[in-house]
């Protein structure tokens, strides 16, 4: 094709591609990318050409770019080899703040070879989907998993050393000896070994001080804390190189998989890989709904907590001023939580096909992702309240605790019926996972919220992660088990991203809170979420 001919479309919407670094001042490297849209255009000579809207894997959507076909390569083994060669060359010549990391660069030590998310150098630290900017004075370090050297190994083939020989069709026990225990609220508390609790601020401070002082035992603690659900298993290294020391410093994010969630994932592994079951698709509670409900739950908890704390102030003026500041803080946190869950959704969409499916389920799961099924699931999610709230909890509870009671007030206590249903759903969650076990206090606090905060909660309850115009996403098909697998992968993504350490400090508590929320919903992982593929395989979903 010459410059005087019409251009041929080379890439399609949704296709995974490799894209060259768009900034010519940076080293010439290739990033994992995805074609979001294809635009047919005409030049001055009325000749056709195509622009491709590209999203860079692991980057914020604000960095999406329109590029020509010359900047793109097909995602195949030959071009992957070129990607590794360019990355190796970039590592040799990088200077200053250039932060491109290639997972398969031969010069990296074997224990760090398979980087699953590649972050390019950007001047703006908000380039990562999970980059947030809420100021915080507390740092939380969590434990994460290691890696394998074998690129042909199943990314999710976990060690079976602690699994029962024949899995039982029910969830394992919630706690094991030596694991971190929980109080009635679902928060981690100290176990027999003296591990710090989730809410122990002094423990976080001590760990922060250790990190600043360069604790000599830090590496050993990281290795001992690694989860068996790591996507990879690191071989034991006989010596430590300078390059390996440098990469250890890049391990900024460590995510501890709690004992309860670990057992859910063991159960999921046994059901799929041992008993040859498949996940019922679409999930009863899809990932999009889980993420949305988490934001709504946290909004209610924060709002009620502010009211209870602020009411202790004696001076009315000072109390009102403090409440106003606290309400502003809650609104800011909730807005950031929306960004966090959207980042989790983006990571899931990118990593599902390559890293979040067991071999035993891959054909079935990908076979379900037909255009018709995706479209129908999207329609169901947009129009069906039962799909969003599959438990069907729609009974109203008055402040006196009577079902369908109004406590002498005509109509719902706090607003329209949808607002009331969502609020009471959140309050029941608090009751179930709280040590106080007194729903009247929570309802009293919710009832006394000022109109401004009620209006904000109403807006939050009506918020959706995906708009009705959004194209169908895989996150409306899959449920909690696949989301939990993504959380195991998440440290690799964040460690390879350009997000700053300060932003990570703010982000980690929100991720920790989300893990706590996920593991408190046992019903998302039970046997009702599985089916026999011989009976249901190849089915089409109808609206």
Swiss-Prot record:
A Pfam cross-reference name: MSL3_chromo-like
Domain (MRG) ranges: 249-542
Q: Where is this region: Disordered?
A: 93-247
The entry's comment on post-translational modification says:
Ubiquitinated by msl-2.
Q: Name one GO molecular function term.
A: chromatin binding
GO process terms (BP) = cell differentiation; regulation of DNA-templated transcription; sex-chromosome dosage compensation
Record SUPFAM superfamilies: Chromo domain-like (SSF54160)
> Listed GO cellular component terms?
MSL complex; NuA4 histone acetyltransferase complex; nucleus; X chromosome
**Predominant subcellular localization, coarse grouping:** nucleus
Tell me the compartments it is located in. Nucleus; Chromosome
Q: Which UniProt keywords apply?
A: Chromatin regulator, Chromosome, Developmental protein, Differentiation, Nucleus, Transcription, Transcription regulation, Ubl conjugation
Q: Where is the composition biased (Basic and acidic residues)?
A: 180-202, 210-224, 234-247
Q: Does the keyword Transcription apply?
A: yes
For this protein, the record's PROSITE patterns field holds: MRG
Instruction: List residues of the Chromo domain.
Output: 10-90
Question: What is its quaternary makeup?
Answer: Component of the male-specific lethal (MSL) histone acetyltransferase complex, composed of mof, mle, msl-1, msl-2 and msl-3 proteins, as well as roX1 and roX2 non-coding RNAs.
Q: Domains: what does the record tell us?
A: The chromo domain specifically recognizes and binds histone H3 trimethylated at 'Lys-36' (H3K36me3). The chromo domain also mediates association with roX1 and roX2 non-coding RNAs, promoting recruitment to the male X chromosome.
Q: What does this protein do?
A: Component of the male-specific lethal (MSL) histone acetyltransferase complex, a multiprotein complex essential for elevating transcription of the single X chromosome in the male (X chromosome dosage compensation). The MSL complex specifically associates with the single X chromosome in males and mediates formation of H4K16ac, promoting a two-fold activation of X chromosome. Acts as a histone reader that specifically recognizes and binds histone H3 trimethylated at 'Lys-36' (H3K36me3) and histone H4 monomethylated at 'Lys-20' (H4K20me1).
Name recorded for this polypeptide: Protein male-specific lethal-3
